[in-house]
């Protein structure tokens, strides 16, 4: 009998261990609620960590928000990155293009009217390892942009295993600031592996071309009144610019005419401008006021100079650090540190690489895909002067700069001039008025129109409603039939298109629910194994009595189950009624504390947190 119980315990333990070690499925990532929001009924979201490097415990955190409306023939998926390096893409999710804004110190959540998930799936990724909710062994942080490309290719491979319905989407990479380095490197890698069908890139206020961008700091600062144009200021800044030029020439000589991402001597230009802005704005012996280098229309206390901006950033930080959010977004227990906007240690390790600047990758990428550069005109740190100069000097698709005669045209949204725009040979550029380093933070709805124009949504809306692209024709009342889960009437004039849409929707739904059912099916098998073993042991214990009644092994198993039920006072019942798999797939576990903020690397730049660091 002891042997039988040992066998039972061993087999049961083996079955349960196999269940525990089963790879994660979609159901493990399903987001059932958002702290501070009354309901998520209008959202379909998944989030959590994906293991991409088992050797170093490398896990990347993602937050996928599915499109509210399907309006294009093929679904669109936007992958968003923030910069730094080492700054979390939760900035993008909660300050810019995501579905929510944290609006007050009570951590109340409001919808974002300019959210990019209206007509496209949006996938926010904290990368590289150590950024935001992502993590790895601390001695395994990445040291180069080529490694970032490999990391993201591995992530996308694992992501598509979890979400196979996304495998045939049109993919776009988007981001801002130092993502101007990330995105071209990631795009180049994904083109080589063809892991996804990459259609285009969107880079906002990007850091891509050191030479042309460093040289435009002084002209921008003087033209926009960041500092007064005095003889002394011009003299001081010319000295800094001359030092930068010498450093650039030396760097080119060492690297066959190419420049790295950062040149330390050139960073002093920016530091000098901010220092001068402090001197002009501050009373003698005062703490000091300086320009906000992310939005020159604002000021900040020295030495923050922009790091206290945006104004709602403290609410976002508190919301992301609270246990309720950590649990709701399915962050792994292995993530020990609290969320922080930017990890200085990640940035410090990334700066150890000696990668060529991403500008050298742009011509090849422009041969095969469209690229949109957009800039807010109030940003100093990655200002529009620098990016416009980059385009003028860039050679792509057979020519240098814009085709002769092309100039920036007025960009009108809903009858209002929102900036300047031009497109030529797969390259589109938009300068947005009254916008900062984080353009969608200031102009969310205009940026949504910009996105829709670029990825083909505006044309689809125009075909549907008869309005012109860019005229704000996104009227939800016109789109009831395209909304996720809805079905058109049989007499609709576009029934053929609807059939295709319903077919795509069915494929996606089948794939998602297949993943959900796998978890329940595995659990059922484990339960049946345990019940079978219990019945077998009961039969062994009572086999003398069973043989007298000529009862079979199968009969004794069911007899044992029946007696077990009766001993509890009656048959077992399903008190919950019909099981709602979407609501009960993930029961909340114990809250856990992510711990204290990781100490920032001592070598990390104090002045700059979302820009290229040196």
From Swiss-Prot:
UniProt-annotated stretches for the region Disordered: 465-503
UniProt entry keywords in alphabetical sequence: Apoptosis, Carboxypeptidase, Glycoprotein, Golgi apparatus, Hydrolase, Membrane, Protease, Signal, Transmembrane, Transmembrane helix
Cytoplasmic face residues: 540-614
Lumenal-side segments: 18-518
Known EC number: 3.4.16.6
Keyword Hydrolase set for record: yes
Biased composition (Basic and acidic residues): 480-491
Membrane-topology annotation of the record: Single-pass type I membrane protein
Reactions performed catalytically: Preferential release of a C-terminal arginine or lysine residue
Location relative to the cell: Golgi apparatus, trans-Golgi network membrane
Biased composition, class Acidic residues, residue ranges: 492-501
Range of residues in the leader sequence: 1-17
Glycosylated residue positions: 42, 426, 434
Gene3D superfamilies: alpha/beta hydrolase
TM ranges: 519-539
Chief subcellular location: Golgi
Known role: Protease with a carboxypeptidase B-like function involved in the C-terminal processing of the lysine and arginine residues from protein precursors. Promotes cell fusion and is involved in the programmed cell death.
Protein name: Pheromone-processing carboxypeptidase KEX1
